[in-house]
Amino acid sequence: SSFVGNVWGVGQSLHVVGEEYKPLPEAIEIVWLSFTENKFYFVSEWLPKNRLQSLFDTVWMNVRKIEQRYNGLVVGMAPYGMIQIWAVGDGRRTEVCCLHGPEVPVKMSEFRPRAIISQDEYVKSTIEDEPRVYENLKKNGLPDSLLFENYRKRFNYHIVPEIEMEDVDLTQIAVHYFNGEYDVILWERLKENLYSLQA
């Protein structure tokens, strides 16, 4: 069990056991507590093998001209039983897949074996530790589930940077996308001016 952070797409809780390099996972099984809903969800699914293999076979050059590859996975858990999985590497975070699972009953004693407070108290105290989130939920409630799906919609982007400062030698640009993806684009690659589908 682990408490995870609240930055979409950014891994904040790390679990590594055994050998340094491992085969790509075939499936995921996870139970989590959605604090904003005070509900447990469960996902048990096969992962898209070809997509994972394709991503982990991808090689790119970083700003120091060193070959890079994806070297990890990040799992994000959202309300309404949604999880999103990203492949991560130096300067890149790319969506692998999005999965959904049902609400499930979980006893607090199973979730936090030494808990001395109820699930409701635990959820309330955890959310109150994030004042901006807490106030926003009180004021606006939880967004519709379509919001999370809409964040994943891809559009054909064509990035054309305009630099106002003179004598600036840019080597890269960092782009954060709504679906949690992230890309550090080398200036040479950006000058190719290719269109790409991004969320």
Locations of the language-model features?
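Tryptophan-paired
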Residues: S2-S34, I173-A199
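Solvent-exposed loop and beta-edge segments used for protein-protein assembly and interaction
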Residues: E20-L24, E37, E67-R69, Y151-Y157
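Exposed beta-strand and adjacent loop surfaces of beta-rich binding modules
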Residues: A27, Y70-G72, M82, N156-H158, ...
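Short acidic/polar inter-strand loop motif in beta-rich domains
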Residues: L33-F42
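Short acidic, gly/pro-rich beta-turn/loop elements at beta-sheet edges
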Residues: F40, Q53-L55, I85, D169-T171
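Short beta-strand edge segments in extracellular beta-sheet folds
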Residues: E45-L52
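Compositionally biased low-complexity segments at domain edges in trafficked proteins
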Residues: S54-Y151
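A eukaryote-biased signal for long
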Residues: E110-A199
